Amino acid sequence: MQVDDLVSIIVPVYNAASYVEQTIKMVVKQDYPKWELLLVDDCSTDGSVEVIKQAISRETSKNPELEGKFVLLEGTVNEGAACARNRGIEHARGRYIAFLDADDIWFPEKLFKELAFMKKMNAAFVCCAYEFGDEQARGTGKVVHVPQKLTYQKALSRTVVFTTTVLLDTSKTGKELIRMPNVKSEDTATWWKIMKQGFPAYGLDEVLAIYRRPPKSLSSNKWKAIRRIWYLYRKQEKLSVIYSLYQLVFWAARATLRRI
């Protein structure tokens, strides 16, 4: 049964032993108290599961009221982030679903402010601004702002929706719509899919998250990013070559400005 005011926070975990305890502590410090944290292990090989178990034990020992708020889903096969998030969606009990990557940062007021904004806008899909961080998650001063409203057509050329900032109301979208396809840039493909069904993303233009971006991370490889977005245009969205090129030009320009 869906719990009306509960936010289900889904964290895919793969070899995140260095970060995941910080992630758990960060969620515990959220101003909004009605949450459950689903940690979905994707067959980690670095001891992430044991770190999670120990961290949960410490947190519940310090505060018995946290008992039952943590769910650890252990994987037996490495399937990727999309499948891990989908497992989390299947097990989520909350009306609201938020995504958080194990190496990213939420500010304590993130859930509270986004949920209030969602209710104010009567929205099914919201996101917020975020700041790029270094390997220690220290802000670099480079902020990605979000428009107040982002439709499917506008989103094709501006990938400003960052997974760690997303909050969804499944009483409006249902769960099936937000399941992620098992492709590269599965998160972007999912946001487009949701928008195409008439649920634009409403942006709270306030920095409530930090995107930890090591210099050699996958996301900072620009050529790989271009190939991924091209694949989405042509294979997922079935756009023509001409229209794909048109969108790619604007996407590349905005992506370059965002990273300068």
Task: List the predicted regions and their residue ranges.
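N-proximal low-complexity "stem/linker" segments adjacent to membrane-targeting elements
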Residues: 1-29
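Short loop->beta transition adjacent to catalytic acidic/histidine clusters or analogous donor-positioning motifs
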Residues: 4-7, 28-39, 47, 68-71
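Acidic helix N-cap motif at the loop->helix transition within catalytic regions
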Residues: 18-21, 46-55, 105, 109
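A conserved acidic beta->alpha catalytic loop
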Residues: 26, 33, 41-52, 77, ...
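Glycine-rich, basic loop-to-helix element that forms the pyrophosphate-binding segment
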Residues: 74-92, 113
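Conserved nucleotide-sugar donor-binding catalytic segment
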Residues: 90, 145-224, 228
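Short aromatic/hydrophobic "clamp" motif used to bind/position activated sugar donors
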Residues: 97
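Conserved donor NDP-sugar-binding/catalytic core segment of glycosyltransferases
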Residues: 109-140
